[in-house]
């Protein structure tokens, strides 16, 4: 099954990071979420109850990203995937990618970050 729902390029300001500068100044985090979901029923019925409401998913991600500061992106991504998988039975798999576009480390790059994939069991 190849059906997906995606939320791409969500941006949130937060104070996450292992470096003290990140905790003091904060930064913008870019989050992409991809959900593996069977969309065939929603395609037939044209009813939002037969799919996953991405507005609700956005609010779940926002509450975590703009919530209590943590050290690791890995921890944020795990919390997001767990929240989505526990709230939405239709989701078979959740992929979360979090990017720091301007972390306080030397170098030239478009961003640094992590990506995880978690099956909904």
UniProtKB/Swiss-Prot annotation:
Domain of life where this protein originates: Bacteria
One cellular component (GO) term of this entry: cytoplasm
Keyword Secreted attached: no
Known catalytic reactions: 7,8-dihydroneopterin = 6-hydroxymethyl-7,8-dihydropterin + glycolaldehyde; 7,8-dihydroneopterin = 7,8-dihydromonapterin
UniProt cross-references to InterPro entries, sorted A to Z: Dihydroneopterin_aldolase (IPR006156), FolB_dom (IPR006157), GTP-CH-I_C/QueF (IPR043133)
Pathway named in the protein's UniProt entry: Cofactor biosynthesis; tetrahydrofolate biosynthesis; 2-amino-4-hydroxy-6-hydroxymethyl-7,8-dihydropteridine diphosphate from 7,8-dihydroneopterin triphosphate: step 3/4
Record has Transmembrane helix as a keyword: no
GO molecular function, one term: dihydroneopterin aldolase activity
Protein EC: 4.1.2.25, 5.1.99.8
Entry's pH dependence statement: Optimum pH is 9.5.
SUPFAM superfamilies (alphabetical): Tetrahydrobiopterin biosynthesis enzymes-like (SSF55620)
Pfam families for the chain: FolB
UniProt: substrate binding residues: 22, 54, 73-74
Family: Belongs to the DHNA family.
PANTHER family linked: DIHYDRONEOPTERIN ALDOLASE 1-RELATED
Protein task: Catalyzes the conversion of 7,8-dihydroneopterin to 6-hydroxymethyl-7,8-dihydropterin. Can also catalyze the epimerization of carbon 2' of dihydroneopterin to dihydromonapterin.
Record text on subunit structure and interactions: Homooctamer. Four molecules assemble into a ring, and two rings come together to give a cylinder with a hole of at least 13 a diameter.
Name of the protein: Dihydroneopterin aldolase
């Amino acid at each position: 099954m190849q059906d997906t729902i995606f939320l791409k390029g969500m941006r949130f300001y937060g104070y996450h990071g292992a470096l003290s500068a990140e905790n003091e100044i904060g930064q913008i985090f870019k989050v992409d979420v991809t959900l593996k979901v069977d969309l065939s029923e929603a395609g037939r019925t044209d009813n939002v109850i037969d799919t996953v409401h991405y507005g609700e998913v956005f609010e779940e991600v926002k509450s975590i990203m703009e919530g209590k500061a943590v050290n690791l992106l890995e921890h944020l991504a795990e919390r997001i995937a767990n929240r989505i998988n526990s709230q939405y039975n239709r989701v078979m798999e959740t992929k979360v990618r979090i990017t720091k576009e301007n972390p306080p480390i030397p170098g030239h790059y478009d961003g640094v970050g992590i990506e995880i994939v978690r099956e909904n069991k």
